[in-house]
C-alpha cells in the first residue's frame, strides 16, 4: 500500500474548522467619544481629566484606549464600544423657525432631532448649529469624524447666508462704508470677526437684503457682526455649507439624504480617507436584568432541612413568591366572554386571613325597579275585580275567568261590578273588554263596542261611523 494521501471525498461532515477570531479594534477614548458625536475632542479630553467618564466601572484616564466590548459610562448613560461598519450618511434638513439644534432642551422647546428619520445602531450628529430664529440649511451626519472636520476652523468651510437688515437710525439704507468695515474686521467679545464676502441683492423702503459668507462657525456670528454697527437683523437664512446647497424644492421642516457620491466628495475635500476603515463607536445599552447562576445549599445536619438558594433561605423565597399566587374558584370553560368578579386576587397570606369573610355583595347596576307606592306600579299591577287577564283555562288566568280547568266559570249571563258580561274569550267579544283605572273617568266609554249596542251604563255606544272607528263619549 502506498503512503500517498487520499484525495478528499465529497461527503458531508459535521466537523467545523476552527474559526479565527477577528482582531479587536482599539482606539483612544476621546476619539471614540467624538466619533459617537458626544462632543469635540478637546472638550472630551477636558471631561476625561475631570473624572466624569468611566470605562468598565473605573474612572477613565487621559490618553487611555478602549477596545470593542468595553462599557463606557457618561452623564449617567451606559454605552458599549462596537465597530462601525456602515458607510457615512449625510442629511440635508431645511430648518424652520422655532426649533433649537440640541437633543434635549431644558425649556421644552421643539428640537430638530424630533422630525429626523430614525436610525438603528447610529445617531445623527449636527454639523454646526443654527439658533432658534435662523432658518435654512442644516447638515447632519452619522460620521463623527466628518462632522468634526467640517466644523473645525482650520478647514475654512464657507457658510453662505441671506440676511435682511434694518439700517441704523437716521439712515435710509446701509452705507457702503459700513460694508467695508465689516469686510475688514470688527472686534467682538470673543475676538476679531469679519465677512469674507458681502453682496447687496435688494432693498425695500425700510430694509436691505444681503448675501454674506463667513468661514467660521461662532455662536450668532452673523447677527453680532451687524449689531456691532447699529444694524438690526430681521431675517437670517443659511443657503450653502461648503459645496452643499439648499435645494429649492425642499420645504421647511423636511429633509433629504445626500447621495453617496457627494459624501465621498466631501471626505476627499477634507482630506479624509476615501474608504472609511473600521472604527469604534458607541451603542447605547438596553437595560436588562440578568440573574446570577443558581446555587442550592442544603444543610443536612439540620433537622428542619433548611435549604439556601444563592445565600437566601428557600422558606423566605417561597414566602416572597406567595404574593404572586392567584386563588380563584375553578369554573367550567366557557367562551371567554364572562369574567368572574368573585375570585380572589390577593396574596396567599392575605387570602388565608380573609377566608372566614363572606364574599362582597355587589349592588345590581342600572336598577330601574320602581319604589313602593309609585303610581306607575299601582297602574301596572292593579286589575279590577271580575276582569280576566288571560284566556280561559290558562294557568295565568285571572279572577272571573277560572284559573283551573276543573273549576266552573261564572254564569256568562251575569253582569260583573263594572257592568260588563263575562264571555269565554274576553277580548273576542265586544262587551267583555277589560276596564282599566284610566277608563273610570268615563265609565260609559267602551272602545270595543258595536254601533247601536247598549253599554252596561245604558248609554249608546260611541263607536261606528264610516270605518267603524272608536270614538270618545259625546255629551249633549
Swiss-Prot record:
Identify the keywords attached in UniProt to this record, alphabetized: Isomerase, RNA-binding, rRNA processing
Which Gene3D superfamilies does the entry mention? Alpha-L RNA-binding motif, Pseudouridine synthase I, catalytic domain, N-terminal subdomain, RNA-binding S4 domain
GO terms, molecular function = 23S rRNA pseudouridine(2605) synthase activity; RNA binding
Q: Looking at the record, which segments are called Disordered?
A: 299-476
* Cited InterPro entries: PsdUridine_s_RsuA/RluB/E/F_cat, PsdUridine_synth_cat_dom_sf, PsdUridine_synth_RsuA/RluA, PsdUridine_synth_RsuA/RluB/E/F, PsdUridine_synth_RsuA/RluB_CS, RsuA_PseudoU_synthase, S4_RNA-bd, S4_RNA-bd_sf
Residues at the catalytic site: 131 (nucleophile)
Under Pfam families, the record lists: PseudoU_synth_2, S4
The main enzyme category here is: isomerase
Composition bias, Basic and acidic residues: 314-333
Sequence ranges of Basic residues compositional bias: 354-363
Q: Name one GO biological process term.
A: enzyme-directed rRNA pseudouridine synthesis
Family indicated by similarity? Belongs to the pseudouridine synthase RsuA family.
> What is the protein name for this chain?
Ribosomal large subunit pseudouridine synthase B
Source organism per entry reads: Xylella fastidiosa (strain Temecula1 / ATCC 700964)
**Species classification:** Bacteria, Pseudomonadati, Pseudomonadota, Gammaproteobacteria, Lysobacterales
Name of the coding gene:
rluB
Amino acid at each position: 500500500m502506498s503512503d500517498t494521501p487520499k484525495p478528499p471525498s465529497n461527503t458531508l461532515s459535521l466537523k467545523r474548522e476552527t474559526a479565527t477570531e477577528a482582531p479587536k479594534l482599539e482606539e483612544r477614548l476621546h476619539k471614540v467619544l467624538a466619533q459617537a458625536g458626544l462632543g469635540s475632542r478637546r472638550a472630551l479630553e477636558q471631561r476625561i481629566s475631570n473624572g466624569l467618564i468611566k470605562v468598565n466601572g473605573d474612572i477613565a484616564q487621559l490618553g487611555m484606549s478602549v477596545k470593542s466590548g468595553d462599557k463606557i459610562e457618561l452623564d449617567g448613560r451606559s454605552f458599549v464600544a462596537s465597530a462601525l461598519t456602515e458607510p457615512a450618511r449625510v442629511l440635508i434638513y431645511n430648518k424652520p423657525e422655532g426649533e433649537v439644534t440640541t437633543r434635549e432642551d431644558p425649556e421644552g422647546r421643539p428640537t430638530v432631532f424630533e422630525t429626523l428619520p430614525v436610525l438603528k445602531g447610529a445617531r445623527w450628529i449636527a454639523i454646526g448649529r443654527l439658533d432658534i430664529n435662523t432658518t435654512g440649511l442644516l447638515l447632519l451626519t452619522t460620521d463623527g469624524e466628518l462632522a468634526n472636520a467640517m466644523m473645525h476652523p482650520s478647514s475654512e468651510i464657507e457658510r453662505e447666508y441671506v440676511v435682511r437688515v434694518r439700517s441704523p437710525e437716521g439712515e435710509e439704507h446701509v452705507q457702503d462704508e459700513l460694508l467695508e468695515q465689516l469686510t475688514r474686521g470688527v472686534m467682538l467679545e470673543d475676538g476679531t470677526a469679519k465677512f469674507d464676502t458681502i453682496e447687496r441683492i435688494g432693498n425695500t423702503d425700510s430694509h436691505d437684503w444681503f448675501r454674506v459668507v463667513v468661514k467660521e462657525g461662532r455662536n450668532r456670528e452673523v447677527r453680532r457682526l451687524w449689531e456691532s454697527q447699529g444694524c438690526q437683523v430681521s431675517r437670517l437664512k443659511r443657503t450653502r455649507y461648503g459645496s452643499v446647497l439648499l435645494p429649492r424644492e425642499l420645504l421647511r421642516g423636511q429633509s433629504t439624504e445626500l447621495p453617496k457620491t457627494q459624501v465621498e466628495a466631501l471626505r476627499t475635500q477634507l482630506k479624509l480617507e476615501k474608504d472609511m476603515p473600521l472604527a469604534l463607536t458607541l451603542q447605547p445599552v438596553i437595560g436588562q436584568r440578568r440573574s446570577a447562576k443558581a446555587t442550592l445549599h442544603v444543610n443536612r445536619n439540620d433537622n428542619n432541612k433548611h435549604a439556601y438558594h444563592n445565600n437566601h433561605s428557600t422558606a423566605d423565597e417561597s414566602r416572597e413568591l406567595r404574593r404572586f399566587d392567584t386563588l380563584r374558584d375553578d369554573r367550567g370553560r366557557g367562551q371567554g366572554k364572562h369574567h368572574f368578579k368573585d375570585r380572589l386576587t390577593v396574596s396567599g397570606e392575605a387570602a388565608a386571613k380573609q377566608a372566614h369573610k363572606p364574599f362582597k355583595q355587589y349592588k345590581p347596576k342600572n336598577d330601574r325597579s320602581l319604589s313602593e307606592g309609585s303610581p306607575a306600579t299601582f297602574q301596572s299591577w292593579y286589575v279590577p275585580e271580575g276582569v280576566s287577564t288571560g284566556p280561559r283555562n290558562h294557568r295565568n288566568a285571572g279572577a272571573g275567568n277560572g284559573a283551573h280547568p276543573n273549576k266552573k266559570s261564572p254564569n256568562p249571563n251575569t253582569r260583573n261590578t263594572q257592568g260588563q258580561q263575562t264571555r269565554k274569550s274576553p277580548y273576542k267579544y265586544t262587551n267583555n273588554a277589560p276596564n282599566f283605572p284610566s277608563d273610570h273617568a268615563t265609565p260609559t266609554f267602551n272602545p270595543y263596542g258595536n254601533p247601536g249596542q247598549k253599554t252596561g251604563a245604558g248609554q249608546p255606544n260611541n263607536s261606528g261611523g264610516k270605518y267603524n272607528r272608536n270614538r270618545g263619549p259625546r255629551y249633549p
